[in-house]
Amino acid sequence: MATSRRVSRVSSLIKREVSQMLLHEIKDDRVGTGMVSVTEVEVSGDLQHAKIFVSIYGSPEAKASTMAGLHSAAPFVRRELGQRMRLRRTPEVSFLEDRSLERGDKILNLLNNLPQAIATEDLEDDDSGLALD
């Protein structure tokens, strides 16, 4: 089993290389339909599996198309990683959609609307308090 420092280094190297491949080398038109960026790479402790989290901007159809293109490009990505990196075994690559940015945006919108909701609730409480007296 590899040390956590080595796993971290391999993870960052995979992230950099896959980002370069997305920009210049993956020719699948489906990958270009949405703006894609690699947000995180999780490598297993034995360096046999790599989960590549990607953030895709665009419509839901573009996201689905882009994910299909990435899944079909996974063998190419693995082969390229094997040629570029000096590892005994190249990790199996899987692409997963990272929705953390969408969740963060949703939470920010809720927090931004919170003062308005509290003010509306206070007004309703004041109105109902007058009716009871």
From Swiss-Prot:
Q: Which Pfam families match?
A: RBFA
Q: Which GO terms describe its cellular component?
A: cytosol
Sorted keywords for this record are: Cytoplasm, Ribosome biogenesis
Q: Which InterPro entries match?
A: KH_dom-like_a/b (IPR015946), RbfA (IPR000238), RbfA_dom_sf (IPR023799), Ribosome-bd_factorA_CS (IPR020053)
The record, for Gene3D superfamilies, names:
3.30.300.20
- One GO process term, biological-process aspect: ribosome biogenesis
Q: Where in the cell is it found?
A: Cytoplasm
Q: Which GO terms describe its molecular function?
A: ribosomal small subunit binding
- Keyword Cytoplasm on this protein? yes
Return the similarity comment.
Belongs to the RbfA family.
On assembly, the entry states: Monomer. Binds 30S ribosomal subunits, but not 50S ribosomal subunits or 70S ribosomes.
Under NCBIfam families, the record lists: rbfA
Q: What does this protein do?
A: One of several proteins that assist in the late maturation steps of the functional core of the 30S ribosomal subunit. Associates with free 30S ribosomal subunits (but not with 30S subunits that are part of 70S ribosomes or polysomes). Required for efficient processing of 16S rRNA. May interact with the 5'-terminal helix region of 16S rRNA.
This protein's name: Ribosome-binding factor A
Q: Which organism is it from?
A: Synechocystis sp. (strain ATCC 27184 / PCC 6803 / Kazusa)
Q: Which gene encodes it?
A: rbfA
